[in-house]
Amino acid sequence: MPDAKKQGRSNKAMTFFVCFLAALAGLLFGLDIGVIAGALPFIADEFQITSHTQEWVVSSMMFGAAVGAVGSGWLSFKLGRKKSLMIGAILFVAGSLFSAAAPNVEVLILSRVLLGLAVGVASYTAPLYLSEIAPEKIRGSMISMYQLMITIGILGAYLSDTAFSYTGAWRWMLGVIIIPAILLLIGVFFLPDSPRWFAAKRRFVDAERVLLRLRDTSAEAKRELDEIRESLQVKQSGWALFKENSNFRRAVFLGVLLQVMQQFTGMNVIMYYAPKIFELAGYTNTTEQMWGTVIVGLTNVLATFIAIGLVDRWGRKPTLTLGFLVMAAGMGVLGTMMHIGIHSPSAQYFAIAMLLMFIVGFAMSAGPLIWVLCSEIQPLKGRDFGITCSTATNWIANMIVGATFLTMLNTLGNANTFWVYAALNVLFILLTLWLVPETKHVSLEHIERNLMKGRKLREIGAHD
C-alpha cells in the first residue's frame, strides 16, 4: 500500500511537470502579445508610420496565428502534439530573431506574421495537449495554467518594455522572446505524446504506457484507455464527421462562438494598446504609461490564480458568468467616465480602478475558461477539426479587434467605443446561460457521449 501511494505521488508530480512544460508555450504567446504594446511608439517614431500601419504591425501577428491555427489541425493529427509544439518553438526562435533585426516596417510585419504562425501552432496544440494529458479532476486547473503562463508572459514583456523604454531600444524588447523559445524547444524533448493521439493512431500499447506514467493507479489508467477505445468507435472523423453529424456541428459551433466571445470582451484592446488607454485616462507622461501597463500585467497574472482556484471547485459556467458581469461593469463605467471627462487625479485613479476591475473579470473567467471549454467539448474523432475551427476563429477575431480599435476611437469616439464592448459583455452573459455546459469533474468521453446523444449543449456535461 505505501508503494502504491508513493507511485501515485510520483505520477502526480510527473503529470504536473509535463503540464508545466507544455504550458510554457503560453509564456511565449503572452510575450508576443505584450511586447508590441511598449515597442509600438518607438517603432512608429523610427519608421515614421501612420496609425493605420501601426494597426497592421499589431494585427499581422494575428493573421499569422490564424493561418498557423488552421494548419495545426493537420500537423497535430499527422505528427502528434509533441512534434507540433516543437515546430512552434522553432518558429518562435526564428520570428523573434527576424523581428529584432528588421531593417524596415515591411520586414517587421512579415516577421510578426512568422511569430503569428508560432503562436497559432502553440495556441492550438498546448490546450489540446493539456486536456488530453491531465486527469479529469484537475483538467481545468492544468489548462488554466496555460492561461497563467500567457499572463506571466504579458507581464514579463511589459517589464522588459519598461526597462528598455528609457533608451527606446525596441529591438531588444522584441528580441527577448528568443530565450524562453529556446527553453521551450529543449523542454519539449522531455514530453510524452498524448495517449489519445496514440490511441487515434491505433497505438494502444504506447497510449497505455503514457497513461501508466501519468495516472495514480494502473486500474485508473486501464479504465481511461477503455473509455478512449469506446470513443474511437465513431466511424467518421474530421471534415466527414462535420458534414454527416449534426451533433458534432453543434460542438464546433459552440467552440467558434466561445472564441468570438473571448475576443470581443475587449481584453486584447487593453493588452495591445495599454499605453494609449492610459493616455485617454489622463496619463500623458510616457513613463507613467509604461508603469501603468506593468500594473495591468501584474493584475492579469494575480487574477488568473482566482480562475485556477475556482475552475475545478466552483465550475466553468458560474465563473464565466461572473466574469462577463464584472467586465460589462468595468467597460460601462470607463465609457461613462470618458463621456463625462477625466479632469482630476481622483477621477484618473477611479478610471484605472475600473480598468483593473475589467482585467480581473477577464483573467478569472474568459481568459482561461474559454480555452478549457474549447478543449473539452469536441469528440475525439473530431477534436483536431473542431479545435482548428475554434482556434482559427480566436485569431481572426483577435485580428479584427487589434485592427479596428484606433479606427473605432476616431469614428465612434472614446466613450462609445468602450460602451460597445460593455454591451457585448452583457450579451455574452445571456449566451453563457443559454448555451455553455458545466464540465467540472466530467471525463472527456462522458461529455462526448452526451453530445452524440443529442442532449442540449448546456447539458452535455451533466451526469446521467
UniProtKB/Swiss-Prot annotation:
Membrane topology, from the record: Multi-pass membrane protein
CDD domains: MFS_GLUT_like (cd17315)
Entry keywords, A to Z: Cell inner membrane, Cell membrane, Membrane, Sugar transport, Symport, Transmembrane, Transmembrane helix, Transport
Protein's gene: galP
Gene Ontology process terms (BP): galactose transmembrane transport; transmembrane transport
Localization, UniProt: Cell inner membrane
Sequence similarity: Belongs to the major facilitator superfamily. Sugar transporter (TC 2.A.1.1) family.
InterPro entries: MFS_dom, MFS_sugar_transport-like, MFS_trans_sf, Myo-inositol_Transporter, Sugar/inositol_transpt, Sugar_transporter_CS
GO CC annotations, alphabetized: membrane; plasma membrane
GO molecular function terms attached to this record: galactose:proton symporter activity; symporter activity
Coiled coil, from the record: none
Periplasmic domain ranges by topology: 37-56, 106-112, 161-171, 272-290, 343-351, 416
UniProt keyword Nucleotide-binding, yes or no: no
Name the record gives this protein: Galactose-proton symporter
